[in-house]
UniProtKB/Swiss-Prot annotation:
The gene is dapH. This is 2,3,4,5-tetrahydropyridine-2,6-dicarboxylate N-acetyltransferase. GO terms for biological process: diaminopimelate biosynthetic process; lysine biosynthetic process via diaminopimelate. Disulfide bonds: none annotated. Its EC number is 2.3.1.89. It is an enzyme of class 2 (transferase). InterPro entries: DapH, DapH_N, Hexapep, Hexapep_transf_CS, Trans_hexapeptide_repeat, Trimer_LpxA-like_sf. PROSITE patterns: HEXAPEP_TRANSFERASES (PS00101). Keywords: Acyltransferase, Amino-acid biosynthesis, Diaminopimelate biosynthesis, Lysine biosynthesis, Repeat, Transferase.
Length: 256
């Protein structure tokens, strides 16, 4: 299998050096007036340019009572703005994490199908025509090959790697490992089917063409072209024509 694009030490440095942020979304009603220095334009409304320079996004019409106003940014920057309210202090705050080091992945340039509700952190690699279903959780450093499907509620831990044209079933877990940095991540080869709710333990490699049965717990490496099942998982047979037909992928699901 190919070497990973990011080593554990590189990920550790990325997290350690990252600016920690506490994202908030503030919804205001009425016509709020601010007194905070540097935040005001001459009309007493927000100075949008100054706010943007502080990483704050402001949405809504501040010239009317009748629309909601939304402020989005880091709590450290937004808090002084709220403390400067002089009237109409009617607002709610939604917090997103606390001192988070890893943002979500910007998926705009990814040539894959990613359904709403998938949680994908930054520094994740996703191949062309992959499919990420709702509820999937993919941690930093994970790699997903082209044409691979990560089904509903599946979890790929840090640095977990899945090859091309594989299927990770609903609720399955590929255990992640970022620390200790010397530990090996899970590596799943090409054309592999991991059944629903199966668990592959840290450091295990699953060879290309193999099948992991639903509910199996895989604690040892799996060779190519075999079926494993049970707790702990054991080889129950080699892949035959019947098994290959039953586990074949559907290309239409990967069309964009």
């Amino acid at each position: 299998m190919e070497a990973q694009k990011l080593s554990a030490q590189e990920i550790i440095q990325f997290i350690g050096n990252a600016e920690k942020k506490t994202g908030v979304k503030v919804t205001l009603s009425g016509m709020p007036s601010f007194k905070s220095a540097g935040f005001l334009a001459e009309n007493g409304r927000p100075n949008f340019k100054a706010l943007a320079n502080k990483g704050i996004q402001v949405l809504g019409d501040f010239h009317t009572h009748y629309s909601l106003k939304i402020i989005i940014g880091d709590w450290q920057a937004v808090r002084p703005l709220l403390e400067g309210l002089t009237e109409n202090k009617d607002y709610t705050i939604e917090f997103e994490g606390r001192n988070s080091a890893v943002p979500l992945l910007d998926t705009r340039a990814i040539n894959a199908r990613i359904e709403p509700g998938a949680i994908i952190r930054d520094q994740v690699t996703i191949g062309d025509n992959a499919v990420i279903m709702m509820g999937a959780i993919i941690n930093i450093g994970a790699e997903i090959g082209e044409g691979t499907m990560i089904d509903m509620g599946a979890v790929l831990g840090g640095r977990a790697t899945v090859g091309k044209n594989s299927h990770i079933g609903a609720g399955a877990v590929l255990a992640g490992v970022i620390e200790p940095a010397s530990a090996e991540p899970v590596r799943v080869g090409d054309n592999v089917l991991v059944g629903a709710n199966a668990v592959v333990i840290e450091g295990v490699q699953v060879g290309s063409g193999s099948v992991v049965a639903a509910g199996a717990i895989v604690t040892q490496d799996v060779p190519e072209n075999v079926v494993v099942a049970g707790v702990p998982a054991r080889i129950i047979k080699e892949i035959d024509e019947k098994t290959a037909q039953k586990t074949a992928l559907e290309d239409a699901l990967r069309n964009l």
